[in-house]
């Protein structure tokens, strides 16, 4: 069997196959790790449904925390064993009917297991944080059941070795996103946001399904290793043509675009901010990571179409710079960073399209940890002030020092500033792309600058600005919220040391001094820009029409929702109206017309009834003669 491309095997996503009977028990039972999350969901159901009402909903939270902790411990043991034994592959038969053989497989590589640990660890700290954030929430058990469902689906996505199973789990992520965004379903705006998020992601899922079905028909297998072998010789052998490869690639790209909130399917992440903040932590840190990992696994297939790669680069570039610009104009605290998530995932898309999977994974891990910490600090602000409007916040630095420090560490971890994690990611990608792709180097540096400016202007407004009425009596958060923030801040600070220790990508610290200066300079330029922005004038609309147009353009997301309503929504509404008219006028009219014709004919025939048998026989004979004459005429004509 041909080996996958060297660049793909380098990061360990291709696993050697060993007999599971020869493996240690923790490795043999790795398939249990996704089930920990699902079991937490099932254990929470008695409290979530109200079957058990004694002692409140907290036992459901404790049970979820326990099974998630077991998942973290089990994953840690497995990743240690895999580092010693090498990559493994577990496979179990699922369904065998005639020639149909469906298998459930798990690729146990270091990169997959590192992503698994990121998912389970983020779920654990998020659940601890939620105990404080949702302390008075009457439906706490329902929230933990949904988080368990979320965790199980994400764990399965990162371990799955089968594209069909990955698609099935991505659909579960779409469902869980809908349920978590609509958690406070009594609010009309929340219901609308949940519906829009679900429908937007469904568009990507349907296109992905078309790609999955087409790929299955062409390759004959859904196992990633089989797909890599097929893709290695697909064009040369004529198994697929350029047009087919292009359509296949575009379909496979659409699903991760929706999951990672990339242009033009990015609106759902902004609207998903209507959900509880602990759910926003998971969505902005690890849910988007799962979508990018699926795209990463599909890259050996996507490279069959140069046009698909160009589309991926265009989508990533537009999302990176566009998301960073839109984030600068937001006054909602959570939305300012949700657009920044879109921006960072755009950079990951560029790295994947340029076949730099190791750097893409580093970006995902560094972004996931720092973004989770940033959203935790945002949640602390919302919990103590019940406000997320930047124009109504200020002076929290002296009142919430732990939260301010966590926000500062998380925000700095997202910017290319020495010595935090993203600095090394930026330096490595800039050094790698500079000789052949200087245009994309500019995209990375501009995004770094805009991100730094955004986090600094938010920090100034929330923590350094004048004290506002809603922040005058704001206390520091309770220990259940402070503990995960402090723990995650320590991990973010230690991330550069961890990266140097494990050396995930050769040459991670070997880029030259000019590259380091360019990355650090773009970050410092962004910090300086954020410091110099006049806050009072920044929030108000300018009296100059030209500047006001730019402000509105960014604040309203380049009018993307308006464009959607004027084009796609209007087109679908017009098609629905035309279909309704056709159904009522043509289809229903034809059926009703036949019925009316039958009634009129019956009324006419009723008048011709004479009761004389001879006239009936004569009518029958004439009809038969006419029918035979017509048939004879047709036969002669033919």
Place the predicted regions along the sequence by residue:
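Transmembrane helix-loop-helix hairpins at membrane boundaries of multipass inner-membrane proteins
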Residues: 3-31, 35, 43-145, 220-242, ...
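Hydrophobic transmembrane alpha-helices and their helix-loop junctions in integral membrane proteins
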Residues: 111-114, 125-166, 175-477, 491-498
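Hard-cation-handling environments
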Residues: 471-527
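Hydrophobic alpha-helical membrane-insertion segments
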Residues: 65-80, 204-214, 410-414, 486-497, ...
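Alpha-helical transmembrane segments and their helix-start/interface "positive-inside/aromatic belt" motifs
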Residues: 56-69, 195-205, 398-406, 475-487, ...
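Hydrophobic alpha-helical membrane-embedded segments
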Residues: 72-76, 371, 449-455, 522-542
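Aromatic-capped, Gly/Pro-kinked transmembrane alpha-helices
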Residues: 505-510, 539-638
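Alpha-helical transmembrane segments
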Residues: 41-45, 324-326, 454, 458, ...
């Amino acid at each position: 069997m041909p080996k996958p491309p060297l660049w793909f095997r380098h990061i360990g996503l291709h696993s050697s196959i060993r007999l599971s009977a020869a493996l240690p028990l923790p490795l043999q039972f790795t398939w249990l790790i996704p089930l920990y999350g699902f079991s937490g969901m099932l254990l929470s159901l008695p409290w979530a449904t109200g079957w058990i009402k004694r002692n409140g909903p907290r036992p459901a939270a404790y049970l979820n925390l326990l099974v998630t902790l077991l998942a973290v411990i089990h994953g840690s043991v497995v990743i240690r064993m895999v580092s010693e034994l090498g990559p493994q592959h577990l496979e179990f038969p699922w369904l065998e009917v005639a020639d149909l053989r469906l298998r459930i497989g798990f690729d146990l590589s270091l990169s997959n297991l590192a992503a698994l640990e990121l998912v389970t660890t983020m779920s654990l700290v998020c659940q601890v944080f939620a105990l404080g954030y949702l302390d008075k929430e009457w439906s706490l058990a329902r929230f933990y059941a949904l988080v368990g469902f979320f965790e199980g689906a994400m764990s399965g996505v990162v371990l799955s070795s089968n594209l069909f199973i990955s698609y099935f789990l991505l659909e579960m992520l779409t469902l869980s996103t809908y349920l978590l965004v609509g958690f406070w379903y009594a609010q009309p705006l929340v219901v609308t946001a949940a519906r829009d998020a679900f429908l937007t992601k469904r568009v990507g899922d349907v296109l992905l399904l078309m790609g999955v079905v087409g790929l299955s028909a062409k390759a004959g297998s859904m196992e990633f290793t089989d797909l890599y072998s097929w893709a290695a010789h697909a064009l040369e052998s004529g198994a697929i043509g350029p047009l087919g490869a292009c359509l296949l690639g575009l379909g496979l790209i659409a699903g991760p675009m929706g999951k990672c909130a990339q242009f033009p399917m990015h609106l759902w992440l902004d609207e998903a901010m209507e959900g509880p903040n602990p759910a926003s932590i998971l969505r902005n840190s690890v849910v988007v990571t799962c979508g990018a990992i699926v795209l990463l696994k599909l890259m050996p297939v996507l490279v069959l179409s140069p046009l698909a790669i160009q589309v991926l680069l265009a989508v990533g570039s537009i999302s990176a710079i566009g998301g960073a610009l839109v984030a600068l104009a937001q006054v909602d605290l959570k939305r300012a960073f949700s657009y920044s998530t879109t921006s960072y995932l755009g950079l990951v898309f560029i790295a994947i399209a340029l076949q730099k999977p190791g750097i893409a994974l580093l970006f995902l891990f560094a972004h996931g940890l720092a973004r989770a910490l940033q959203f935790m600090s945002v949640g602390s602000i919302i919990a103590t002030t019940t406000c997320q409007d930047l124009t109504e916040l200020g002076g929290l630095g002296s009142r919430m020092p732990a939260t301010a420090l966590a926000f500062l560490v998380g925000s700095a971890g997202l910017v290319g500033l020495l010595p935090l994690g993203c600095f090394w990611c930026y330096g490595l990608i800039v050094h790698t792309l500079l000789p052949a792709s200087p245009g994309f180097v500019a995209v990375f540096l501009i995004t770094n600058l805009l991100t730094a400016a955004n986090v600094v202007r938010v920090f100034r407004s929330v923590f350094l600005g004048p004290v506002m009425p809603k922040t005058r009596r704001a206390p520091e958060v309770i220990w259940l919220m402070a503990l995960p923030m402090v723990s995650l801040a320590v991990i973010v600070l230690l991330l550069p040391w961890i990266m140097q220790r494990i050396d995930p990508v050769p040459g991670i610290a070997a880029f030259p001094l000019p590259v380091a200066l360019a990355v650090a300079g773009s970050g410092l330029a962004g910090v300086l820009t954020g410091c110099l922005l006049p806050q009072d004038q920044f929030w108000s609309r300018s009296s100059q029409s030209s500047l006001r147009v730019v402000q509105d353009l960014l604040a309203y997301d380049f009018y993307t929702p308006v464009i959607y309503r004027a084009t796609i929504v209007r087109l679908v509404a017009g098609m629905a109206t035309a279909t309704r008219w056709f159904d009522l006028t043509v289809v229903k009219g034809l059926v009703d017309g036949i019925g009316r014709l039958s009634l009129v004919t019956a009324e006419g025939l009723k008048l011709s009834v004479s009761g004389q048998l001879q006239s009936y026989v004569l009518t029958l004979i004439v009809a038969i003669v006419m029918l035979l004459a017509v048939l004879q005429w047709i036969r002669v004509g033919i």
